[in-house]
Amino acid sequence: MSLPVVAVVGRPNVGKSHLFNRVIGEATAIVSDEAGTTRDRHFGEAEWAGRQFWLVDTGGLVEDSHLLMDTAIRRQVMQAIEEADLMLFVVDAKVGVHPSDARIVDILRNSQKPWMLVANKVDDPASTDFYEFFRLGVTDVYPVSAQNGKGSGDLLDAVVANIPEVEEEERDAVRVAVIGRPNVGKSSFVNRLLGEDRLVVSDESGTTRDAIDAPMRYHDTDLVFVDTAGLRRQSRIDDGVEFYSALRTRRAIDSSDVCILMIDATEGLQNQDLKIATMAWEAGRGLILVINKWDLYEDKTDKSADKFKKEAVEKVPYLKFVPFLFTSAISGQRVTKVLDIVLSVQEQRTRRISTSEVNDALGDLLARLQPPQAAGREVKLNYATQVEIEPPTIAVFGNNPEAIPEHYVRFLHNGFRERWGFTGAPLRIILRRKNS
């Protein structure tokens, strides 16, 4: 499920970032206890009136000293048009209509994308003359004060009325996102799998751009490689590409069942690779690490692959549960093996263990190690059951779940994995009070 994108655009110093923070604050921010899953410096996931959407703050894209201001603003708006489902064009009600505002309106009007004009810094609608913005030919102006929150509720009502409905997809096919840093060989890998002449595309309405899904059938299973438009096409705009790539990556992850993270073997595992891997893992998606350009890896021996994986696991321990595949997209070496791994990971991700089996496993683990006491009192774990799939989630019930330390949760996690594997799939452990 890929959420709509709402981009905040406008001149510098009109309060875009303040509005972003206000809206994220007024809306129900969808947060997680796990770091890095919902909030970024420039975009956040929000919910209003039961509707979810991404809100994007483009403020950081303009303050580039080497660019002329009008050029920077125009590029900012053009990027938003390419990426977003709805633009919020923010103007300064205290300054009034600025010459750049009229030029931005012309761009937005020609874009054929929905947009709304938001007059910021309207602390008191009765005393602020924001009506002059109707001179720009708009039918509605939404007065707000990012400072004190006035008008933000009406604005959010209008936002959710103007973004496309998101319908839960019936996923008969396994949806696969190929993600990773630029220039690691993602497009070559997909083309090698599918073949250019076999690339079947379908335009999806209501997306941020013309996203392309590439379907194929393998061993009687339908696979769909999602968001391949971003893999095959370079952005028409150079500035701010990294800014939007994180959002594109997150949307591709949200639309997928299994993520293939491409790594450049010649560059090794970079911090950005780890951030992307964690983004997919914490989102509950299946994960496969494909080490591309393995044919170019220097001083390779028969132990190089094991060494590469060992170093990766030392950096991020959960990667020991993730399958690695060492390939060359250019030569085709081992590329098609990923299809069997995708099917296996999705099977693990949708696997359901009977309650009796889960309790047998819990009993064995308790026989090996009891949870530590809390404040001199015994902590008991009574029973466990699997409550979810995609990803597998096991609830463990006891008399004082809040007192169980993190290291014991890891012990349970590792013990369950020893028994069932769940290779490539996140495994979540939930602690609950008995009879809750």
Swiss-Prot record:
Question: Matching InterPro entries, A to Z?
Answer: G_ENGA (IPR031166), GTP-bd (IPR006073), GTPase_Der (IPR016484), KH_dom-like (IPR032859), KH_dom-like_a/b (IPR015946), P-loop_NTPase (IPR027417), Small_GTP-bd (IPR005225)
Question: Which residues belong to any copy of the EngA-type G domain?
Answer: 4-167, 174-350
Query: Biological process (GO) annotations?
Result: ribosome biogenesis
Keyword Repeat on this protein?
yes
Please provide an example of a Pfam family that matches this protein in its UniProt record.
Answer: MMR_HSR1
- In this protein, which residues make up the domain named KH-like? 351-435
This protein's name: GTPase Der
Organism per entry: Gemmatimonas aurantiaca (strain DSM 14586 / JCM 11422 / NBRC 100505 / T-27)
